[in-house]
């Protein structure tokens, strides 16, 4: 059987994988905080620069963008989460699990064939126009990677011994 690259294949499996990787990075951070006797809030509120979101905010944005993608590609409204309760590592794991579940709920049949379908997304005060493929490959995937990389960098900057393989979900994730 020959695999083909479809809009579904280019988005949904990778987004789920990115959520798995994000969870791995956070678990490394939580374990490191426990091992070093550091209050978890030190990591959860840390940021790379004063004008950037802290770790919790980075996770919230990564999950928000990731979960919206398949719904927008399918032409449906993405679920909205109440991000007020994300104050612990366990809260972030629950957010990631909910995101994975919502991403997985959109089917291949709902997405494939919609590569050229045009739609608008309101981003703050501005509305942007996309096609399915430009939204997935030009907006969603780069943004999710950016915010997950920032989580990785925040933890790394705070002494968590993360390596490149951890970004990909750990050594066992690559097979």
Task: Mark where each language-model region is.
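Alpha-helical scaffold segments that form or flank carboxylate-/histidine-based iron centers
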Residues: 3-17, 39-64, 82-92, 124-143, ...
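Structural signal for well-ordered, non-membrane alpha-helices
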Residues: 19, 23-30, 67-70, 97-104, ...
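Surface-exposed helix-capping loop/turn segments at secondary-structure junctions
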Residues: 29-36, 106-113, 157-162
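Short secondary-structure junction/hinge motifs that connect adjacent elements
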Residues: 30-50, 114-121
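Conserved alpha-helical segments that form or flank metal/cofactor-binding pockets of metalloenzymes
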Residues: 51-79, 99-107
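Long amphipathic alpha-helical coiled-coil segments
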Residues: 75-87, 157-163
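Acidic/histidine-rich alpha-helical segments that form the ligand environment
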Residues: 85-123, 128-155
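C-terminal end-helix/capping segment
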Residues: 156-175
């Amino acid at each position: 059987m020959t695999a083909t690259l479809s809009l579904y294949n280019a988005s949904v499996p990778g987004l789920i994988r990115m959520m798995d990787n994000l969870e791995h990075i956070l678990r490394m951070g939580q374990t490191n905080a426990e091992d070093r006797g550091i209050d978890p809030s030190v990591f959860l509120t840390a940021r790379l620069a004063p004008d950037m979101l802290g770790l919790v905010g980075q996770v919230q944005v990564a999950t928000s963008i990731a979960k919206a993608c398949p719904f927008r590609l399918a032409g449906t409204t993405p679920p909205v989460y109440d991000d007020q309760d994300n104050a612990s590592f366990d809260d972030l794991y629950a957010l990631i699990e909910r995101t994975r579940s919502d991403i997985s709920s959109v089917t291949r049949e709902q997405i494939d064939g919609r590569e050229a379908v045009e739609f608008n997304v309101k981003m703050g005060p501005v509305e942007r126009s996309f096609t399915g493929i430009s939204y997935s490959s030009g907006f969603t995937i780069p943004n999710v990677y950016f915010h997950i990389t920032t989580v990785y960098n925040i933890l790394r900057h705070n002494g968590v011994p993360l390596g490149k393989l951890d970004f990909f979900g750990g050594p066992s994730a690559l097979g």
